[in-house]
Regions:
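Elongated, amphipathic alpha-helical interaction scaffolds
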Residues: 1-230
Length: 230
C-alpha cells in the first residue's frame, strides 16, 4: 500500500494461497469521517494488487479497533455522511465500516481471545468500568514490549514505555508486574523531583556550586539551574 499507510495490515493465507488482506485501524477517539478514510485504504490495497498484476484479486477487509470509553457515536457508512439527491441514490455505492468497541466487550467476549490481546482488551474494559482501576491481571504476557507499546499509544501514558526501558523489564511477566514497576518508577521520579527542588532551594540561598555538588550530582545541579532560568 504505497498511497496510504495503515496501522496494521495482514495477509490471510491458507495452504500458501492468499485469501484476503486484513487491515486494522486503532482508534482512541471517534472520527466522524472515518468511513471515507477506510475506503481510501481499501482502494489503495486493490490498486496495489492491480499494479502487481496479481493472478486473482484478494478481498480487502478493514476493521476498526476503538479503545475509547464512550460508545462510537458517529455514522459507520459513507452514505450517511453525504447529501445525495434521491435521483442519484440508487447509483451511489455505499461503504460500511466495522467498528469493535474494545472497552465495551463483555466478559464472555473477552474469554474468546487466546492471545496477548485478551490482556489488552481486559485492561480497557476494566478502565472503562472503573477509572481508578489498577492493573491486577495475572495472565502471563507473551510479547511484553508489544503490549506495553500498544498501551502507551492507546492510553497516551508514556510511563508504559519507561517500563520497557527499565533494567528490570525482564522480570515483567504480567500486568500485575507492570503495575508494580509503574509504582516503583513513580517513587523514583518523586525522589528525583524532591532532590531537584532541594538543589533549587540551595541555589536560591546563595550556596556555591562546589558546596552543592558535595551532596548532589552535576546533572541534578544543571537541571535545577535550567528550571530556574526557564
Amino acid at each position: 500500500m504505497h498511497e496510504q499507510e495503515r496501522d496494521v495490515a495482514k495477509k490471510w493465507k491458507r495452504y500458501n494461497v492468499q485469501l484476503a488482506i486484513i487491515g486494522i485501524e486503532n482508534q482512541t477517539a471517534v472520527e466522524k469521517k472515518m468511513p471515507f478514510r477506510l475506503i481510501g485504504y481499501d482502494g489503495a490495497s486493490y490498486k496495489s494488487q492491480l499494479q502487481a498484476n496479481a493472478a486473482s484479486i484478494a478481498p480487502v477487509v478493514t476493521i476498526v479497533l476503538y479503545f475509547g470509553e464512550k460508545h462510537w457515536c458517529k455514522e459507520r457508512n459513507i452514505k450517511s455522511l453525504m447529501n445525495i439527491p434521491k435521483e442519484l441514490d440508487p447509483y451511489v455505492n455505499d461503504y460500511k465500516m466495522e467498528v469493535f468497541e474494545i472497552a465495551w466487550l463483555t466478559d464472555e467476549q473477552l474469554e474468546m481471545f487466546k492471545s496477548d490481546f485478551k490482556v489488552v482488551a481486559r485492561f480497557f474494559v476494566n478502565k472503562r468500568r472503573d477509572p481508578d482501576y489498577v492493573a491486577d491481571d495475572p495472565t502471563e504476557i507473551q510479547h511484553v514490549d508489544e503490549v506495553l507499546k500498544l498501551l502507551s499509544v492507546m492510553t497516551g501514558d508514556r510511563d508504559y514505555e519507561k517500563v520497557i526501558c527499565d533494567e528490570m523489564k525482564g522480570q515483567v511477566k504480567s500486568m500485575c508486574d507492570v503495575a508494580e514497576r509503574l509504582k516503583n518508577i513513580g517513587r523514583q521520579e518523586g525522589r528525583s523531583e524532591e532532590r531537584i527542588n532541594a538543589v533549587k532551594f540551595a541555589i536560591s540561598l546563595g550556596a556555591s556550586e562546589e558546596k552543592i555538588l558535595k551532596q548532589y550530582s552535576k546533572e541534578e545541579y544543571e537541571k535545577a539551574l535550567a528550571l530556574m532560568k526557564a
